[in-house]
Amino acid sequence: MKKNLLCAVFASAVFSGSVLADDISGTWKTIDDKTGSSKAILEMRQESNGTYTAKIIKVTPRPGYTPKETCVNCPAPYTNKPILGLDILTGLKAANDNHFVNAKVLDPLTGKIYSGKAKLSANGKRLTLRGYVGVSALGRSQTWIKQD
């Protein structure tokens, strides 16, 4: 009996993380951490395995800047793929209390792939995404604003 109760408590603790995090599916506007301007509009979707993927559905370049049309410097399978429609975030998984982990983030301008984690604001309108290599302290953060 004690063994069954212990298993139930353990299972509850393990699976509660994904229950507590809000659904982040929808349309998001990215805000560049260096310029403060929007770079793109993304569509975030939840995959059948419960992780999230985000693709670029609109490029919003700052005035006077002509964006690249293809992912020239990107590794396979992204090499020379159109940036519009490109999945730039994959594997983002709910952890707990509006925290998300285990993402892979592609920067289509440099072709670099980063590890990523995110935190959703209390009102569900802002997602702060942190991309990094190795240690989170050595990364960059970007804010995404919910559009719908």
What are these regions (language model features)?
Residues 21-28:
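Cleaved targeting-peptide boundary
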Residues 74-80, 128-135:
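Short aromatic-glycine motifs in intrinsically disordered, low-complexity regions
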Residues 126, 132-148:
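Edge beta-strand at a domain terminus
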